[in-house]
């Protein structure tokens, strides 16, 4: 099997992002976005998905966190799409129901070539640490659009926003890793292409 590694750089007037993604890693990461809570969520994603990621993001945080978080989602999606290549042999589908204390989250994915996000999560507070809670859905919307995957995220229960968000990123890492697992040498579609 070829190494499933991708390097992506994106520079706009709002952000500059460099990322290296190894799908078949062991959970090592070096993450710097300037947004502590977001860094923590990406670390959880890497640890639970066993992805190796190096990301350095510089953005217009003097305005807010929107451009940085959204653009990291875009770059992660681009890196994933590049690393997964023609998707030959992957499992394609995965789902999980993951608890974190009182929070219970369902995440399901189809590496389909069709971008779609169903995000049924409400946060009680406007901020998660210094991160705008509305940016969680924007991160996933950006990832889904660039990675060309179908992703469902649903909060079954949860009172503590931190627990809910942690459970989402842990579950996301686990389902993405599982769906990327090589199970044979065929394209997982009756059409013969994804």
UniProtKB/Swiss-Prot annotation:
| One Pfam family from the record | IGPD
Record-linked CDD domains: IGPD
Any single Gene Ontology cellular-component annotation:
cytoplasm
What residue range is the signal peptide?
A: none
Its Enzyme Commission number(s) read 4.2.1.19
Known catalytic reactions? D-erythro-1-(imidazol-4-yl)glycerol 3-phosphate = 3-(imidazol-4-yl)-2-oxopropyl phosphate + H2O
Q: Which UniProt keywords apply?
A: Amino-acid biosynthesis, Cytoplasm, Histidine biosynthesis, Lyase
For the keyword Amino-acid biosynthesis, the answer is yes
Broad class of where this protein is predominantly found: cytoplasm
State the Gene Ontology terms under molecular function.
imidazoleglycerol-phosphate dehydratase activity
Compartments, as annotated in UniProt: Cytoplasm
The record lists the membrane-crossing segments as none
Q: Give the GO biological process terms.
A: L-histidine biosynthetic process
PROSITE patterns xref list: IGP_DEHYDRATASE_1 (PS00954), IGP_DEHYDRATASE_2 (PS00955)
Annotated InterPro entries: IGPD_sf, ImidazoleglycerolP_deHydtase, ImidazoleglycerP_deHydtase_CS, Ribosomal_Su5_D2-typ_SF
Q: In which pathway does it act?
A: Amino-acid biosynthesis; L-histidine biosynthesis; L-histidine from 5-phospho-alpha-D-ribose 1-diphosphate: step 6/9
Q: Which HAMAP family match?
A: HisB (MF_00076)
Member of which family? Belongs to the imidazoleglycerol-phosphate dehydratase family.
Q: Under what name is this protein listed?
A: Imidazoleglycerol-phosphate dehydratase
| Species whose genome carries this gene | Caldicellulosiruptor saccharolyticus (strain ATCC 43494 / DSM 8903 / Tp8T 6331)
What lineage does UniProt assign to this protein's organism? Bacteria, Bacillati, Bacillota, Bacillota incertae sedis, Caldicellulosiruptorales
């Amino acid at each position: 099997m070829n190494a499933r590694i991708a390097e992506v750089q994106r520079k706009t007037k709002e952000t500059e992002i460099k990322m290296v993604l190894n799908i078949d890693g062991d959970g090592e990461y070096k993450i710097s976005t300037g947004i502590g809570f977001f860094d923590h969520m990406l670390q959880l994603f890497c640890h639970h998905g066993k992805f190796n990621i190096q990301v350095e993001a510089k953005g217009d945080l003097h305005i807010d966190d929107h451009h940085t978080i959204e653009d990291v989602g875009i770059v992660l999606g681009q890196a994933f799409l590049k690393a997964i290549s023609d998707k030959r042999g992957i499992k394609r589908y995965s789902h999980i129901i993951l608890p974190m204390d009182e929070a219970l989250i369902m995440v399901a994915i189809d590496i389909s070539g069709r971008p779609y996000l169903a995000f049924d999560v409400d946060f009680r507070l406007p901020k998660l640490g210094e991160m705008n809670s509305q940016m969680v859905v924007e991160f996933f919307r950006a990832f889904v659009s660039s990675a060309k995957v179908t992703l469902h995220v649903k909060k079954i229960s949860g009172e503590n926003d931190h627990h809910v968000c942690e459970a989402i990123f842990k579950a996301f890492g686990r389902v993405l890793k599982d769906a990327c697992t090589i199970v044979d040498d065929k394209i997982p579609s009756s059409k013969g292409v994804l």
